[in-house]
Every structure is written in C-alpha cells, then in structure tokens.
Amino acid sequence: MIRPQTILNVADNSGAKKLMCIRVLGGSYKQSANIGDIIIAVVKQATPNMPLKKSDKVRAVVVRTAQGVQRENGTFIRFDDNAAVVINKDDNPRGTRVFGPVARELRDRKFTKIVSLAPEVL
C-alpha cells in the first residue's frame, strides 16, 4: 500500500534512485496505491549525468509492495521493498532495463512492456 509521502526504490535504469509519492491517480478519493497503480512522484535521489534529476516530477507504476497482495486463487505475495518503474505519458517505461522481480498483476493491467523487461515475474 503506497500513500502520499511514501519513499519508493526505483526498479529501472532511468536515472532516479528514490521516489516520493505525492499523488495516487485513479479517482478523487483514492488514497493508496497497490501493485499496478500509477502514481505521481518526485525524484528524491538521482544518479549523476542522467536524464532524471532530483526534484523532477514523474509518473511511475508500482511494481513491488512490502504489504503484498492476495490473488484470486488465495495465494499471498509480498516483497522486501516498495518499488516503482518510471513511465512516460504513453505508459511505456523510460528506462531500458528493469531490476528485480515484478508481480504478475502488471500483465493484467496492460504493462506488458515492463513485464517483458523484468528478469523474473512472480
């Protein structure tokens, strides 16, 4: 569960290292984001000499949450950290690589490009 002011790791090579969620998209009263939801975030830590700089506002999709999600078959999946992938206006990733595992729920949410770049889909 990602709420505003939550710090997330970045799971791609877009140049950002840490993001802070400032808004959860998807309705005027939606307060928390789960895996596959789009958020507006601010870059809090960045790699030098890369396109994304500190204090840039970006769109990102949540790919891992520490709280986890329960699937329809009853299994429960939980990750070690909260992580997101930076995306552009067309919902394509801005980086060319994705690090770490991602959840299978991204495929249902039409983020197939992120799923294909990921080394492991759980």
Swiss-Prot record:
Identify the Gene3D superfamilies for this entry. Ribosomal protein L14
Cellular localisation: Plastid, Chloroplast
What are the UniProt keywords, alphabetically?
A: Chloroplast, Plastid, Ribonucleoprotein, Ribosomal protein, RNA-binding, rRNA-binding
Q: What's any one GO cellular component for it?
A: cytosolic large ribosomal subunit
Q: Which PANTHER family match?
A: 50S/60S RIBOSOMAL PROTEIN L14/L23, LARGE RIBOSOMAL SUBUNIT PROTEIN UL14M
Family affiliation: Belongs to the universal ribosomal protein uL14 family.
Q: Give a short account of what the protein does.
A: Binds to 23S rRNA.
The identity of this protein, by name, is Large ribosomal subunit protein uL14c
Origin species: Tupiella akineta (Green alga)
